[in-house]
Amino acid sequence: MSQITMRQMIEAGVHFGHQTRFWNPKMAQYIFGARNKIHIVNLEKTLPMFQDAQEAVRRLVANKGTVLFVGTKRQARDIIREEATRAGMPFVDYRWLGGMLTNYKTVKQSIKRLEEKTAALENAAESGFSKKEILEMQRDVEKLERSLGGIKNMKGLPDAIFVIDTGYQKGTLVEAEKLGIPVIAVVDTNNSPDGVKYVIPGNDDSAKAIRLYCRGIADAVLEGKNQALQETVAAAQEAAAE
């Protein structure tokens, strides 16, 4: 698992919070102080808390669990998509649709529609559709792909959710709480840690910081997968030896 260091966190600007006037008092225990009216996050707390989050992810994935990566703000989108894809995990990078988890049955129907439309589009030319009709089909598929592409291979509800910016993803937290799904989240000084099982106090605006968090969680996923694979191989060898 990637060992993130204090120096790397400083270089990525993890310690820079928001302007002091926007602070959330519930984050007081994670704030070191203020500089130029900007809150400074206490990295001596952030580092071990991030490591705890990584360990929780590794254990969960080693037990065949699924982690849903969520980050729909502009700075997070590409990074969330890249790192979740690298880890082979589902993601939401465009927009959180209300009921994405609490109304998963309906979402599954939309995913089925996406699959059907994609298949129809692949055979559209041979099926005699006009160029205009094919263009409309492409637009439909692109729209559905943007919203659901990251979760189309998700086999049911996730076992945990990794979130960048709890203020931006309030809908995600509400649904996770309703369903009892644990949340691992980056929480900046202007947001509340309520409803988050594994809090990672830190900057949620800098692309460098977001990359550091996502890479670290994706690495933990890959380590968990590797452990699960090794255990499966060991069990198969044991069974063969009997």
Curated annotation (Swiss-Prot):
Cellular component terms per the entry's GO annotation: cytosolic small ribosomal subunit
PROSITE patterns assigned to the protein according to its UniProt record, in alphabetical order: RIBOSOMAL_S2_1 (PS00962)
Keyword field contains Ribonucleoprotein: yes
Note: Present in outer membrane vesicle formulations which are used as vaccines in human.
PANTHER family recorded: 30S RIBOSOMAL PROTEIN S2 PROKARYOTIC AND ORGANELLAR, SMALL RIBOSOMAL SUBUNIT PROTEIN US2M
Family, similarity comment: Belongs to the universal ribosomal protein uS2 family.
Protein name, as recorded: Small ribosomal subunit protein uS2
Species the sequence originates in: Neisseria meningitidis serogroup B (strain ATCC BAA-335 / MC58)
